[in-house]
A protein has these predicted regions:
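Residues immediately C-terminal
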Residues: 134-135, 149
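Conserved catalytic/switch belt of AAA+ P-loop NTPases
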Residues: 116, 141-158
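P-loop/Walker A NTP-binding region and its immediately flanking N-terminal helices
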Residues: 1-131, 137-138, 155
């Protein structure tokens, strides 16, 4: 099972898995913790499970046309899971920045200008923002409007 790689976060893993199973996904999450505590691994794990073809509720139908329960965890075998492992999943975006902080231009170019484009191959378009505490005030304000009125398919994960 994929979640065995993440240690000491069972309560968070269960929360994410239950949210996927029940179809109650929020449009934004904050994952907070010390440097080196595995925040990025947890965010990728969640994004991978969200995009996993096995968890896609549209495909969660058996041969008889009956809905089946989605597992809430990533299978690790489907095309989307393999793309996520190689960091090539087109609907999971990792926000990057070159300066000492995340400026308004990075937020506008990498999130705000991109978020209205529907997902390419998955049910969600997921943005992972590492070190989000390094956003300038202007970047925070630019992101705030997007978080307040996101498209239904968008999920933003802030790591601090």
């Amino acid at each position: 099972m994929e979640s065995e790689r993440i240690l000491g976060q069972n309560h968070i893993l269960r929360h994410f898995e239950n949210a996927i199973r029940m179809g109650k996904i929020s449009h934004a999450y904050i994952i907070n913790g010390e440097e080196g505590s595995g925040k990025m691994n947890l965010a990728i794990h969640f994004a991978k499970a969200l995009q996993c073809e096995r968890n896609n509720s549209n495909k969660a139908i058996n041969e008889d046309g009956e809905r089946i329960t989605v597992p809430g965890t990533a299978c690790g075998q489907c095309k989307s899971c393999k793309q996520t492992d190689s960091k090539n999943q087109p609907d999971i975006k990792y926000i990057t920045y070159e300066k000492s902080g995340i400026g308004v231009d990075e937020i506008r170019e990498q999130i705000n200008d991109d978020i209205d484009i529907k997902p390419y191959s998955s049910p969600y378009k997921i943005y992972i923002v590492p070190e989000s505490e390094k956003m300038t005030v202007q970047a925070q304000n630019a992101l705030l409007k997007t978080i307040e009125e996101p498209p239904e398919y968008a999920i933003i994960i802030l790591l601090t």
